[in-house]
Each structure stands twice: as structure tokens, then as C-alpha cells.
Amino acid sequence: TAESSLDAAETGHLVFTTLHANSSCTSLTRLLDMDVPKYKLNSTVRGVLAQRLLRKVCTGCGIKRPISEIDARETGILKNTQIMYANKLTAEEKYNRKKEGTLCAKCQGVGYKGRIGAYELLLLDRKITNALSDGMTTKEVEQLAVEQNSMLTLRDYGLELVKDNLTTISEVKRVCSSE
């Protein structure tokens, strides 16, 4: 159970465990929802790592072009930045391209090939543990971690991967939504 893991941590053991949650901050809320005492959480948890796998844009058929105005506004990526867009084909387009011999050999028209990790590390320091003790919401704790500790959220990490031309904005939106 969650509490027995924290009991082991209190005795000096290094404990790694898995918890299903949407972000590192919601993991803490999940533990509190499991009736783990706040004092135990504050005294034993040092950090929480959230991770997601994003599909990598295909290097064989991905399209590099300037970011759209809408995407730039939604993401904060500079307007003229060149980013990759997936060349996803419909079933009919795949069939026709296969017949013509022009279907991408790397991804078979999916637009993506392989996966890459996106990570969010929340380090629990005095500010964060005090915020939890004070009953701050998950969003408020996340905002505090971003502002005070320079934490990158899953979405922000994903957008860095977009800037590095490793994935697409639509993939980050699909996988790293905060709801």
C-alpha cells in the first residue's frame, strides 16, 4: 500500500514506486486521497517523476515548415520557428501511394515512427511541502513549482521536443494535456 511504502522510507530505505496520475503534482493529491497523512508525505517523499511517451515524427516524410499562427499563439513558440508536422495519410491515400510505390518506407503513411519520453520532475522542498500542508490545489502547487523551482511541466517538456523537431504539437496536445 501507499502508506507501507512511506513507512519503509521513514526507516531510511530508498523507495521507488509507481502511481498512475496525470502529472507529478496530481500524484501527491492521489496519495493524499489514499489517506496518507500529510506529515508522512512531507517527511518522506523527495521527488515525483511523471512521464509520457510521445510518438516521434517520421524523418522520412515529416514536413518542416514555419509554425502556424494559431499554434504559435497556443504554445508560445516564436512565430517564424520551423517545426515538423506529421504527414498522416488517410486509408485511401495509403492504398493509392502503396500502389504507386510512393508510400513512406519508414512509417507506412502513419506520419510517426518510434517514441520519445517526456518528463516532469517535481522536487519536494520546503515551499512545496508547505503548500501541500496549507491545502493548495494541484494547479497552485504546479504553478509554485514552475515559478519557484523552474519545473518543466510535461507540456513544456513536450514543446521543447517540438522545437528540437522530434515530435509535433498535435502529439504534445494529445498526450500531455493537463486535464
Locate each region found by the language model.
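Short, flexible helix-loop junctions that flank or precede catalytic/ligand sites
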Residues: 1-179
